[in-house]
Amino acid sequence: MGKIYFGVVADDFTGASDAASFLVKAGVPTVLFNGIPDAEPEFSEETRAVVIALKTRTMPREHAVAESLAAFRKLKRMVASQLYLKYCSTFDSTSEGNIGPVADAVMKAWNIPYTVLCPSLPVNGRTVKNGILYVNGVPLAESPMRNHPLTPMRDSRLVNLIEMQSEFSAKVIGSSSMVAAGSVAAGKPCYLIPDYETDEDGDRIAAFFGNLSFLTGGSGLIGALGRRYVKLYGTIQECSRSSVPRKDSASTGKALVLAGSCSAMTLRQIADYTGRGAVSYRLLPDELLDGRQNVEKVFAWIQEQESGSLIFSSASPEDLEKSQKLGKERVAAKIEETLAGLARMAAEHGYTRIIVAGGETSGAVTQALGYQAFQIGESVAPGVPVMTPLANPSLRLVLKSGNFGQEDFFTRALEMTGKENIPC
């Protein structure tokens, strides 16, 4: 086992793969684990970052804290030099959320006086200015995230968002001198919120705070920390800067596309994909709940189609509001169970490419497939890599958060995983 520098814990699987992809892009060899690894995991000597994917975003608070601390303690036993709590670039956490409680618990456990709160991911339009989180130039609370079915975001000010959850205070340091930030943080534990509008801002933040033993944020900052690491210590990787060679992003065999996200971008991606002639099957909450639709019936339909059929539960805000009258948690659980079951059956029947849209859906799919460790390959879009289970080298998984990717994302993912790419 090599010397582990970065130890990252993410609150869902797509967030974990997002973070891992930015580390790989920076030149940091990375392995991703689905859940806390058993015993002492084995990975290559070159590995410098370990990312652990949990499913704690909407978990009851006490369980989320306990599981997250267990993951961080595992990383400390791997002798990780720096710990990182990865959450979504749109924060995705209400007053009942877990970002604050988990970060508080880590700071208490290791006597950490302060850390940063940096959800920004400029390449995907997530930026912070004067403590306000923006999505493509629009304050978070005025963006489509306002109507997220599980974590509706009704406030754009990061101070308010974190202080609703945390025992500690938060301070906006904006674009002020990082030197002054140290004095701002003196005293009781607190969170510092710098301006972060560009990748250059990320590099500046990483340069000043890069020696902290614990940081929090999105994949933008972890990418900047990766670049700092490579600048200081060099990189083992050459050529594609990927833990999996480019030519191995492809796999022969049939593909299945699953979409459980109701984000505005996923809805556009579905429209683009079906507009290109893709066959699709929509899951309806009432029919899933009364048994008219189930895994076996839907998979029988899939087997009658050519490769690349789309199964989706994604709905407009209006349709979503109607379906939630059936019980928000009940509907969400049934949809996740169905899509995960379809992924499992597809893998059992020899499908080698599974594309998934939606963070909660992706977490359910990875749990259903049962693979624990993944190598990270090249990215279909920023933060969305092609992944290969170490236990099944023929399978390619592409799992994305709902808002990530281009409108033609599904087509791109199928093309990238279905043909040989030019070796470097």
PLM feature segments, named:
Residues 48-56, 305-307, 388-424:
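A structural-propensity feature for long, helix-poor, extended segments
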Residues 19-21, 95-99, 126-134, 184, ...:
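Short acidic, glycine/serine/threonine-rich loops at helix termini
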Residues 2-46, 66-67, 120-123:
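N-terminal basic/disordered segments at the start of proteins
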Residues 351-352, 360-409:
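Conserved, well-ordered active-site substructure
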